[in-house]
Amino acid sequence: MTELKNDRYLRALLRQPVDVTPVWMMRQAGRYLPEYKATRAQAGDFMSLCKNAELACEVTLQPLRRYPLDAAILFSDILTVPDAMGLGLYFEAGEGPRFTSPVTCKADVDKLPIPDPEDELGYVMNAVRTIRRELKGEVPLIGFSGSPWTLATYMVEGGSSKAFTVIKKMMYADPQALHALLDKLAKSVTLYLNAQIKAGAQAVMIFDTWGGVLTGRDYQQFSLYYMHKIVDGLVRENDGRRVPVTLFTKGGGQWLEAMAETGCDALGLDWTTDIADARRRVGNKVALQGNMDPSMLYAPPARIEEEVATILAGFGHGEGHVFNLGHGIHQDVPPEHAGVFVEAVHRLSEQYHR
């Protein structure tokens, strides 16, 4: 494989010295960019864009042409795994993702296959290989998956949810069915991420978008336990380099200590967690990624820079910080403001790495 020209992101995740704090943005390939909208229109719809390796590669690279980002992230969706299990994913205008056959009971779970990542999810691996080739070693490529709990919420609710009553009903009334589903998902996600690593992903991230809707005890049993299983099953070395793993539970700031015990390399923080506090609690064990409120990108440039400076000062001197937003960039943010953000992170962080 090509020599990596900028490995700042991978080094920071392993808490090794870097010259400046690396930065990337969740959903950096997305609807805030006019060029993304044009490519998506060319593809026809969102899943067609995900399933076309050349177009998925094009949108992955678009933000890197605009901004000096320190990592590329595979353009895909967390719902590729349930889609490959045969749930019939489709997108309803204004409603987001839906499934034609949601999981309602243990019998439904028993019927679900564990997808072969090189077969049913082969289009994702093709995209990873294509992107790695086109990156030419400029920056590392991040692979990702949704967490078992987060994928299960969509599969049981039949799509997006606000109250999560359907899956919580299963959790409390039929926990066996939910554990069976989560176990199957943990196996599927482990295979899926390992296939991404084999195809060329140089780091992986597990997005637990909905872990924060659980009580502490339920989080341990129904979300963290299964993420821990995945971390245990991942290939951690490829191409002679360590493959760092980041766990991100949105709304999970109160559980950082437990998350750091899983053996992951880094934790993603949302914007509701104080980064100085997070570093005090777990900084001797894991790197931290985050954590500016994505809505801050609506602010004038000077205010964005001020917020970047505050977060950098909060983390302080030394290694183990990857700058990011606390969740995905919003679709109506001015692209220039994202540029201000990225440039400010590099310029203002230098003093913390001397």
Curated annotation (Swiss-Prot):
EC number in record: 4.1.1.37
- Superkingdom of origin organism: Bacteria
The entry's protein name is Uroporphyrinogen decarboxylase
Per its UniProt record, what InterPro entries does this chain match?
UROD/MetE-like_sf (IPR038071), Uroporphyrinogen_deCO2ase_HemE (IPR006361), Uroporphyrinogen_deCOase (IPR000257)
Q: From the UniProt record, report the name of the gene that encodes this protein.
A: hemE
Record site: Transition state stabilizer: 77
Q: What UniProt keywords apply to this chain's record, in alphabetical order?
A: Cytoplasm, Decarboxylase, Lyase, Porphyrin biosynthesis
Example of a GO cellular component annotation carried by this entry: cytosol
Q: Could you give a single Gene Ontology term from the biological process aspect?
A: protoporphyrinogen IX biosynthetic process from glutamate
The protein's matches in HAMAP family, at most eight in alphabetical order, are given as:
URO_D (MF_00218)
Q: Which organism is it from?
A: Escherichia coli (strain 55989 / EAEC)
Q: Which reaction does it catalyse?
A: uroporphyrinogen III + 4 H(+) = coproporphyrinogen III + 4 CO2
Q: How does it assemble?
A: Homodimer.
Q: Which family does it belong to?
A: Belongs to the uroporphyrinogen decarboxylase family.
Molecular function terms, GO-annotated: uroporphyrinogen decarboxylase activity
Instruction: Tell me where in or outside the cell this protein is found.
Output: Cytoplasm
Q: What does this protein do?
A: Catalyzes the decarboxylation of four acetate groups of uroporphyrinogen-III to yield coproporphyrinogen-III.
Q: Does the keyword Lyase apply?
A: yes
Using the chain's own numbering, where are the disulfide bonds?
none
